[in-house]
Amino acid sequence: MKPIWDKGKPVNDLIQRYTVGLDREMDMYLAKYDVMGSLAHITMLESIGLLEKEELVALSAELKNLLDLIEEDNFVIEDGVEDVHSQVELMLTRKLGDMGKKIHSGRSRNDQVLVDLKLFTRDKLRGVVNSVKALFDILIKQSNRYKDVLLPGYTHLQIAMPSSFGLWFGAYAEALADDMLFLRAAFEQSNRNPLGSAAGYGSSFPLNRQLTTNLLGFESMNYNVVYAQMTRGKLERNVAYALATVAATLSRLAFDACMYNSQNFGFIKLPDDCTTGSSIMPHKKNPDVFELTRAKCNRLQALPQEITLMTNNLPSGYFRDMQLVKEVFIPAFDMLEDCITMVAYMLEHITVKEDILSDSKYDAIFSVEEVNRLALEGVPFREAYKQVGASIENGTFVPNKEINHTHQGSIGNLCNDMIVSKMEQILKEFPFETIDEAINRLTSK
Protein backbone atom coordinates (compact mmCIF):
# COMPACT_ATOMS: atom_id res chain seq x y z
CA MET A 1 0.00 0.00 0.00
CA LYS A 2 1.51 3.33 -1.05
CA PRO A 3 1.58 6.13 1.55
CA ILE A 4 -0.59 9.17 0.90
CA TRP A 5 2.59 11.21 0.38
CA ASP A 6 3.76 8.87 -2.42
CA LYS A 7 5.56 10.66 -5.28
CA GLY A 8 5.96 7.65 -7.56
CA LYS A 9 9.32 6.57 -6.18
CA PRO A 10 10.05 3.24 -4.44
CA VAL A 11 9.40 3.15 -0.69
CA ASN A 12 12.11 1.57 1.48
CA ASP A 13 10.27 -1.02 3.59
CA LEU A 14 12.91 -0.86 6.34
CA ILE A 15 12.52 2.90 6.66
CA GLN A 16 8.75 2.62 6.44
CA ARG A 17 8.57 0.04 9.22
CA TYR A 18 10.87 2.05 11.48
CA THR A 19 9.11 5.38 10.97
CA VAL A 20 5.60 3.97 11.37
CA GLY A 21 6.58 2.12 14.57
CA LEU A 22 3.60 1.70 16.90
CA ASP A 23 1.66 4.50 15.27
CA ARG A 24 -0.99 2.23 13.78
CA GLU A 25 -1.66 0.66 17.18
CA MET A 26 -1.88 4.04 18.90
CA ASP A 27 -4.05 5.47 16.14
CA MET A 28 -6.76 2.92 16.83
CA TYR A 29 -7.47 4.92 20.00
CA LEU A 30 -7.89 8.03 17.84
CA ALA A 31 -10.04 6.52 15.07
CA LYS A 32 -13.45 7.86 16.09
CA TYR A 33 -12.00 11.29 16.80
CA ASP A 34 -10.36 11.35 13.37
CA VAL A 35 -13.75 10.69 11.79
CA MET A 36 -15.38 13.42 13.90
CA GLY A 37 -12.71 15.88 12.82
CA SER A 38 -13.29 14.93 9.19
CA LEU A 39 -17.05 15.44 9.55
CA ALA A 40 -16.47 18.96 10.82
CA HIS A 41 -13.82 19.66 8.18
CA ILE A 42 -15.94 18.61 5.19
CA THR A 43 -18.90 20.61 6.52
CA MET A 44 -16.63 23.63 6.56
CA LEU A 45 -15.26 22.82 3.06
CA GLU A 46 -18.79 22.77 1.67
CA SER A 47 -19.55 26.11 3.34
CA ILE A 48 -16.66 27.79 1.47
CA GLY A 49 -17.40 26.13 -1.87
CA LEU A 50 -14.71 23.45 -1.95
CA LEU A 51 -17.31 20.66 -1.87
CA GLU A 52 -20.70 20.43 -3.51
CA LYS A 53 -23.74 19.87 -1.32
CA GLU A 54 -24.30 16.36 -2.70
CA GLU A 55 -20.64 15.53 -2.05
CA LEU A 56 -21.00 16.63 1.56
CA VAL A 57 -24.08 14.44 1.95
CA ALA A 58 -22.32 11.39 0.49
CA LEU A 59 -19.08 11.90 2.42
CA SER A 60 -20.93 12.54 5.69
CA ALA A 61 -22.95 9.35 5.28
CA GLU A 62 -19.82 7.27 4.71
CA LEU A 63 -17.98 8.87 7.61
CA LYS A 64 -20.91 8.11 9.90
CA ASN A 65 -20.83 4.52 8.65
CA LEU A 66 -17.17 4.44 9.66
CA LEU A 67 -18.16 5.69 13.12
CA ASP A 68 -20.52 2.72 13.37
CA LEU A 69 -17.70 0.36 12.35
CA ILE A 70 -15.46 1.85 15.03
CA GLU A 71 -18.15 1.59 17.72
CA GLU A 72 -18.69 -2.06 16.73
CA ASP A 73 -14.91 -2.77 16.90
CA ASN A 74 -14.91 -3.68 13.21
CA PHE A 75 -12.58 -0.91 12.06
CA VAL A 76 -8.97 -1.85 11.31
CA ILE A 77 -5.92 -0.07 9.95
CA GLU A 78 -4.83 -2.36 7.15
CA ASP A 79 -1.32 -3.68 6.66
CA GLY A 80 0.72 -1.21 4.68
CA VAL A 81 -1.42 1.78 5.70
CA GLU A 82 0.59 4.28 7.73
CA ASP A 83 -2.00 5.67 10.09
CA VAL A 84 -5.67 6.24 10.83
CA HIS A 85 -5.84 9.35 8.64
CA SER A 86 -4.67 7.36 5.63
CA GLN A 87 -7.06 4.50 6.41
CA VAL A 88 -10.11 6.77 6.60
CA GLU A 89 -9.21 8.49 3.34
CA LEU A 90 -8.55 5.12 1.69
CA MET A 91 -11.95 3.75 2.71
CA LEU A 92 -13.75 6.86 1.49
CA THR A 93 -11.92 6.72 -1.84
CA ARG A 94 -12.75 3.04 -2.31
CA LYS A 95 -16.40 3.79 -1.70
CA LEU A 96 -16.78 7.18 -3.38
CA GLY A 97 -13.87 7.42 -5.81
CA ASP A 98 -12.26 10.81 -6.37
CA MET A 99 -14.75 12.42 -4.01
CA GLY A 100 -12.91 10.76 -1.12
CA LYS A 101 -9.68 12.43 -2.20
CA LYS A 102 -11.17 15.90 -1.67
CA ILE A 103 -11.46 15.74 2.12
CA HIS A 104 -7.82 16.67 2.70
CA SER A 105 -8.16 20.09 1.08
CA GLY A 106 -6.95 22.77 3.49
CA ARG A 107 -5.73 20.20 5.97
CA SER A 108 -2.46 18.48 6.90
CA ARG A 109 -1.91 15.36 8.93
CA ASN A 110 -0.27 17.75 11.39
CA ASP A 111 -3.47 19.57 12.32
CA GLN A 112 -5.45 16.38 11.76
CA VAL A 113 -3.59 14.49 14.48
CA LEU A 114 -3.71 17.58 16.67
CA VAL A 115 -7.49 17.75 16.56
CA ASP A 116 -7.67 13.97 17.07
CA LEU A 117 -5.53 14.27 20.19
CA LYS A 118 -7.51 17.24 21.49
CA LEU A 119 -10.81 15.37 21.08
CA PHE A 120 -9.35 12.18 22.55
CA THR A 121 -7.84 14.02 25.51
CA ARG A 122 -11.04 15.94 26.16
CA ASP A 123 -13.00 12.68 26.21
CA LYS A 124 -10.53 10.78 28.39
CA LEU A 125 -10.21 13.65 30.85
CA ARG A 126 -13.96 13.53 31.26
CA GLY A 127 -13.65 9.87 32.24
CA VAL A 128 -10.95 10.72 34.79
CA VAL A 129 -13.08 13.56 36.18
CA ASN A 130 -16.03 11.21 36.65
CA SER A 131 -13.85 8.57 38.31
CA VAL A 132 -12.26 11.10 40.64
CA LYS A 133 -15.72 12.37 41.61
CA ALA A 134 -16.86 8.80 42.37
CA LEU A 135 -13.84 8.24 44.63
CA PHE A 136 -14.39 11.64 46.23
CA ASP A 137 -17.96 10.67 47.11
CA ILE A 138 -16.78 7.46 48.78
CA LEU A 139 -14.15 9.34 50.79
CA ILE A 140 -16.71 11.88 52.00
CA LYS A 141 -19.16 9.11 52.88
CA GLN A 142 -16.53 7.22 54.88
CA SER A 143 -15.34 10.42 56.53
CA ASN A 144 -18.84 11.17 57.78
CA ARG A 145 -19.42 7.54 58.75
CA TYR A 146 -16.26 7.28 60.87
CA LYS A 147 -15.98 10.89 62.02
CA ASP A 148 -15.93 9.91 65.70
CA VAL A 149 -13.40 7.06 65.41
CA LEU A 150 -10.05 8.34 66.64
CA LEU A 151 -6.75 7.51 65.00
CA PRO A 152 -3.13 8.33 65.89
CA GLY A 153 -1.69 11.22 63.94
CA TYR A 154 1.99 10.94 63.04
CA THR A 155 4.86 13.26 62.26
CA HIS A 156 8.23 11.74 61.33
CA LEU A 157 6.41 8.38 61.73
CA GLN A 158 6.34 9.12 65.48
CA ILE A 159 3.00 9.31 67.28
CA ALA A 160 2.09 12.98 67.41
CA MET A 161 -1.49 14.08 68.11
CA PRO A 162 -4.97 12.61 67.97
CA SER A 163 -6.52 12.38 64.54
CA SER A 164 -9.60 10.54 63.29
CA PHE A 165 -10.77 8.47 60.38
CA GLY A 166 -13.06 11.38 59.62
CA LEU A 167 -10.01 13.57 59.12
CA TRP A 168 -8.08 10.89 57.22
CA PHE A 169 -10.78 10.13 54.68
CA GLY A 170 -11.73 13.80 54.44
CA ALA A 171 -8.13 14.87 53.83
CA TYR A 172 -7.92 12.78 50.69
CA ALA A 173 -11.33 14.01 49.59
CA GLU A 174 -10.15 17.61 49.78
CA ALA A 175 -6.91 16.64 48.05
CA LEU A 176 -8.96 15.34 45.13
CA ALA A 177 -10.93 18.59 45.05
CA ASP A 178 -7.67 20.48 44.59
CA ASP A 179 -6.50 17.91 42.03
CA MET A 180 -9.69 18.64 40.10
CA LEU A 181 -8.40 22.18 39.54
CA PHE A 182 -5.49 20.73 37.58
CA LEU A 183 -7.86 18.53 35.57
CA ARG A 184 -9.99 21.59 34.83
CA ALA A 185 -6.97 23.51 33.55
CA ALA A 186 -5.88 20.54 31.44
CA PHE A 187 -9.40 20.21 30.05
CA GLU A 188 -9.49 23.88 29.10
CA GLN A 189 -6.26 23.51 27.12
CA SER A 190 -7.59 20.44 25.33
CA ASN A 191 -10.81 22.27 24.48
CA ARG A 192 -9.24 24.60 21.88
CA ASN A 193 -9.47 23.88 18.17
CA PRO A 194 -6.20 23.53 16.19
CA LEU A 195 -7.94 22.54 12.94
CA GLY A 196 -7.09 24.90 10.10
CA SER A 197 -3.47 25.36 11.12
CA ALA A 198 -2.63 22.73 8.47
CA ALA A 199 1.10 21.94 8.52
CA GLY A 200 1.58 24.78 10.98
CA TYR A 201 1.42 27.77 8.67
CA GLY A 202 -2.23 27.96 7.68
CA SER A 203 -3.69 27.72 4.18
CA SER A 204 -4.46 29.89 1.15
CA PHE A 205 -7.98 28.43 1.21
CA PRO A 206 -10.48 30.75 2.99
CA LEU A 207 -10.98 28.28 5.85
CA ASN A 208 -13.72 29.03 8.37
CA ARG A 209 -12.02 27.95 11.58
CA GLN A 210 -14.82 29.27 13.78
CA LEU A 211 -17.23 26.90 12.08
CA THR A 212 -15.16 23.79 12.85
CA THR A 213 -14.67 25.12 16.38
CA ASN A 214 -18.43 25.29 16.86
CA LEU A 215 -19.12 21.97 15.13
CA LEU A 216 -16.71 20.09 17.40
CA GLY A 217 -17.90 21.82 20.57
CA PHE A 218 -14.58 23.49 21.29
CA GLU A 219 -14.65 26.43 23.68
CA SER A 220 -12.27 28.42 21.46
CA MET A 221 -9.39 27.82 19.07
CA ASN A 222 -5.62 28.01 19.05
CA TYR A 223 -5.63 31.19 16.99
CA ASN A 224 -2.02 31.47 15.87
CA VAL A 225 -1.36 28.64 13.40
CA VAL A 226 2.30 28.32 14.41
CA TYR A 227 1.33 28.10 18.06
CA ALA A 228 -1.36 25.53 17.25
CA GLN A 229 1.45 23.20 16.14
CA MET A 230 3.53 24.17 19.16
CA THR A 231 0.78 22.78 21.40
CA ARG A 232 1.74 19.28 20.23
CA GLY A 233 3.77 17.92 23.11
CA LYS A 234 2.89 20.88 25.33
CA LEU A 235 -0.72 19.73 25.61
CA GLU A 236 0.32 16.19 26.47
CA ARG A 237 2.86 17.39 29.03
CA ASN A 238 0.40 19.70 30.78
CA VAL A 239 -2.31 17.05 30.82
CA ALA A 240 0.27 14.60 32.17
CA TYR A 241 0.93 16.99 35.07
CA ALA A 242 -2.79 16.91 35.89
CA LEU A 243 -2.86 13.11 35.77
CA ALA A 244 0.31 12.98 37.86
CA THR A 245 -1.29 15.23 40.49
CA VAL A 246 -4.15 12.79 40.95
CA ALA A 247 -1.68 9.90 40.91
CA ALA A 248 0.36 11.53 43.69
CA THR A 249 -2.73 11.70 45.90
CA LEU A 250 -3.55 8.05 45.23
CA SER A 251 0.03 6.94 45.83
CA ARG A 252 0.10 8.63 49.22
CA LEU A 253 -3.27 7.16 50.17
CA ALA A 254 -2.05 3.72 49.09
CA PHE A 255 1.01 4.01 51.33
CA ASP A 256 -1.17 4.98 54.29
CA ALA A 257 -3.48 2.05 53.61
CA CYS A 258 -0.59 -0.44 53.41
CA MET A 259 0.84 0.87 56.66
CA TYR A 260 -2.48 1.04 58.51
CA ASN A 261 -3.31 -2.50 57.37
CA SER A 262 -0.06 -4.02 58.68
CA GLN A 263 -0.13 -6.02 61.91
CA ASN A 264 2.05 -3.49 63.74
CA PHE A 265 -0.59 -0.83 63.13
CA GLY A 266 -3.83 -2.73 62.60
CA PHE A 267 -5.96 0.37 62.10
CA ILE A 268 -7.86 -1.02 59.12
CA LYS A 269 -8.72 -4.49 57.89
CA LEU A 270 -9.21 -5.55 54.29
CA PRO A 271 -11.67 -8.30 53.33
CA ASP A 272 -9.95 -11.59 52.58
CA ASP A 273 -11.01 -11.46 48.94
CA CYS A 274 -9.27 -8.10 48.58
CA THR A 275 -5.90 -9.50 49.61
CA THR A 276 -3.45 -12.04 48.21
CA GLY A 277 -1.44 -14.77 49.90
CA SER A 278 2.09 -16.11 50.05
CA SER A 279 3.45 -19.31 48.51
CA ILE A 280 5.34 -20.12 51.72
CA MET A 281 3.76 -18.18 54.60
CA PRO A 282 0.19 -19.37 55.27
CA HIS A 283 -0.67 -16.43 57.51
CA LYS A 284 -0.10 -13.72 54.89
CA LYS A 285 -2.87 -11.42 53.65
CA ASN A 286 -1.11 -8.91 51.45
CA PRO A 287 -2.52 -5.53 50.33
CA ASP A 288 -1.32 -6.04 46.75
CA VAL A 289 -3.97 -3.76 45.27
CA PHE A 290 -2.65 -0.79 47.21
CA GLU A 291 0.97 -1.76 46.51
CA LEU A 292 0.37 -1.98 42.77
CA THR A 293 -1.59 1.27 42.90
CA ARG A 294 1.37 2.94 44.60
CA ALA A 295 3.77 1.68 41.93
CA LYS A 296 1.51 2.55 39.00
CA CYS A 297 0.84 6.01 40.39
CA ASN A 298 4.54 6.61 40.96
CA ARG A 299 5.08 5.60 37.34
CA LEU A 300 2.40 8.07 36.25
CA GLN A 301 4.20 10.81 38.17
CA ALA A 302 7.18 10.29 35.86
CA LEU A 303 5.03 10.87 32.76
CA PRO A 304 5.47 14.68 32.56
CA GLN A 305 9.24 14.28 32.69
CA GLU A 306 9.17 11.52 30.06
CA ILE A 307 7.19 13.73 27.68
CA THR A 308 9.42 16.71 28.45
CA LEU A 309 12.55 14.75 27.56
CA MET A 310 11.05 13.69 24.23
CA THR A 311 9.94 17.18 23.24
CA ASN A 312 12.39 19.50 24.98
CA ASN A 313 14.57 21.90 22.96
CA LEU A 314 12.61 21.45 19.73
CA PRO A 315 12.18 24.61 17.64
CA SER A 316 8.78 25.70 16.37
CA GLY A 317 7.18 23.54 13.70
CA TYR A 318 6.37 19.84 13.54
CA PHE A 319 8.89 17.05 14.12
CA ARG A 320 8.43 13.28 14.04
CA ASP A 321 9.67 13.09 17.63
CA MET A 322 6.08 13.89 18.61
CA GLN A 323 4.88 10.51 17.34
CA LEU A 324 6.52 8.72 20.27
CA VAL A 325 4.64 10.83 22.80
CA LYS A 326 1.44 8.98 21.90
CA GLU A 327 2.94 5.70 23.10
CA VAL A 328 3.28 6.90 26.69
CA PHE A 329 0.46 9.45 26.78
CA ILE A 330 -2.50 7.50 25.42
CA PRO A 331 -2.27 4.49 27.82
CA ALA A 332 -1.88 6.76 30.87
CA PHE A 333 -5.59 7.54 31.10
CA ASP A 334 -6.69 3.92 31.41
CA MET A 335 -3.92 3.21 33.91
CA LEU A 336 -5.02 6.09 36.14
CA GLU A 337 -8.70 5.21 35.85
CA ASP A 338 -7.93 1.61 36.83
CA CYS A 339 -6.10 2.85 39.92
CA ILE A 340 -8.93 5.18 40.90
CA THR A 341 -11.52 2.44 40.43
CA MET A 342 -9.58 -0.06 42.54
CA VAL A 343 -8.89 2.41 45.34
CA ALA A 344 -12.58 3.31 45.43
CA TYR A 345 -13.52 -0.37 45.63
CA MET A 346 -11.05 -1.07 48.44
CA LEU A 347 -12.08 1.95 50.50
CA GLU A 348 -15.73 0.96 50.28
CA HIS A 349 -14.95 -2.46 51.74
CA ILE A 350 -12.41 -1.76 54.49
CA THR A 351 -13.23 -2.12 58.17
CA VAL A 352 -11.79 0.39 60.63
CA LYS A 353 -10.70 -0.49 64.15
CA GLU A 354 -12.55 1.17 67.02
CA ASP A 355 -10.90 2.34 70.27
CA ILE A 356 -7.38 2.44 68.85
CA LEU A 357 -6.30 5.18 71.25
CA SER A 358 -7.42 3.23 74.33
CA ASP A 359 -4.13 1.33 74.05
CA SER A 360 -1.67 2.74 76.63
CA LYS A 361 1.12 2.94 74.05
CA TYR A 362 -0.74 5.93 72.63
CA ASP A 363 -1.06 7.78 75.96
CA ALA A 364 1.59 10.34 75.03
CA ILE A 365 -0.46 11.36 72.02
CA PHE A 366 -2.69 13.32 74.42
CA SER A 367 0.22 15.41 75.76
CA VAL A 368 -0.65 18.47 73.68
CA GLU A 369 -4.23 18.28 74.95
CA GLU A 370 -2.89 18.49 78.51
CA VAL A 371 -0.54 21.36 77.63
CA ASN A 372 -3.45 23.26 76.11
CA ARG A 373 -5.65 22.56 79.16
CA LEU A 374 -3.02 24.05 81.47
CA ALA A 375 -2.57 27.05 79.16
CA LEU A 376 -6.31 27.69 79.25
CA GLU A 377 -6.07 27.70 83.07
CA GLY A 378 -3.49 30.49 82.88
CA VAL A 379 -0.20 28.60 82.93
CA PRO A 380 2.19 30.10 80.32
CA PHE A 381 2.32 27.77 77.34
CA ARG A 382 6.08 27.13 77.53
CA GLU A 383 5.84 26.36 81.27
CA ALA A 384 2.91 24.01 80.65
CA TYR A 385 4.96 22.33 77.91
CA LYS A 386 7.82 21.71 80.36
CA GLN A 387 5.52 20.38 83.08
CA VAL A 388 3.85 17.86 80.78
CA GLY A 389 7.18 16.87 79.24
CA ALA A 390 8.61 16.19 82.69
CA SER A 391 5.61 14.07 83.70
CA ILE A 392 6.04 11.96 80.56
CA GLU A 393 9.74 11.49 81.26
CA ASN A 394 9.21 10.40 84.89
CA GLY A 395 6.23 8.18 84.08
CA THR A 396 3.59 10.14 85.97
CA PHE A 397 1.65 11.46 82.97
CA VAL A 398 -2.02 10.46 83.10
CA PRO A 399 -3.82 11.49 79.91
CA ASN A 400 -7.27 12.96 79.73
CA LYS A 401 -8.57 11.27 76.59
CA GLU A 402 -11.47 13.61 75.97
CA ILE A 403 -11.07 15.46 72.68
CA ASN A 404 -12.59 18.90 72.19
CA HIS A 405 -11.48 20.19 68.78
CA THR A 406 -14.09 22.56 67.35
CA HIS A 407 -12.36 24.90 64.89
CA GLN A 408 -12.88 24.54 61.14
CA GLY A 409 -11.32 21.42 59.68
CA SER A 410 -10.57 19.75 63.01
CA ILE A 411 -11.73 16.44 64.49
CA GLY A 412 -14.99 17.89 65.77
CA ASN A 413 -15.68 20.14 62.79
CA LEU A 414 -14.62 18.38 59.59
CA CYS A 415 -16.16 20.95 57.22
CA ASN A 416 -17.00 18.18 54.78
CA ASP A 417 -19.93 20.23 53.51
CA MET A 418 -17.50 22.97 52.49
CA ILE A 419 -15.23 20.44 50.78
CA VAL A 420 -18.20 19.05 48.86
CA SER A 421 -19.19 22.59 47.87
CA LYS A 422 -15.67 23.25 46.61
CA MET A 423 -15.75 20.13 44.44
CA GLU A 424 -19.21 20.89 43.07
CA GLN A 425 -18.18 24.41 42.12
CA ILE A 426 -15.21 23.12 40.12
CA LEU A 427 -17.31 20.46 38.39
CA LYS A 428 -19.78 23.11 37.21
CA GLU A 429 -16.99 24.67 35.16
CA PHE A 430 -16.65 21.65 32.85
CA PRO A 431 -18.77 22.29 29.70
CA PHE A 432 -19.72 18.65 29.18
CA GLU A 433 -23.31 19.32 28.11
CA THR A 434 -22.28 21.88 25.49
CA ILE A 435 -19.80 19.41 24.02
CA ASP A 436 -22.33 16.58 23.99
CA GLU A 437 -24.86 18.71 22.14
CA ALA A 438 -22.31 19.70 19.49
CA ILE A 439 -20.98 16.17 18.94
CA ASN A 440 -24.48 14.69 18.80
CA ARG A 441 -25.49 17.22 16.14
CA LEU A 442 -22.34 16.49 14.16
CA THR A 443 -22.53 12.69 14.23
CA SER A 444 -26.27 11.98 14.22
CA LYS A 445 -27.66 10.29 11.10
Language-model features, listed with the residues they occupy:
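Short linear loop/turn motifs
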Residues: A58-A61, V226-T231, Q387-S391
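Generic, well-ordered alpha-helical scaffold segments in large soluble proteins
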Residues: H41, E62, L66-L69, M91, ...
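A helix-coil-helix interface module used to build multimeric assemblies
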Residues: M1-G202, L207-T213, T276-G277, L292, ...
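Glycine-rich cofactor/substrate-binding loops
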Residues: M1-G37, D98-M99, G266, M281-K445
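Charged, flexible cofactor/metal-binding loops and thiol motifs
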Residues: K118-L125, V129-N130, N144, P152, ...
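Short, well-ordered beta-strand elements within core beta-sheets of diverse protein domains
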Residues: T43-L51, L167, R237-T245, E369-E377
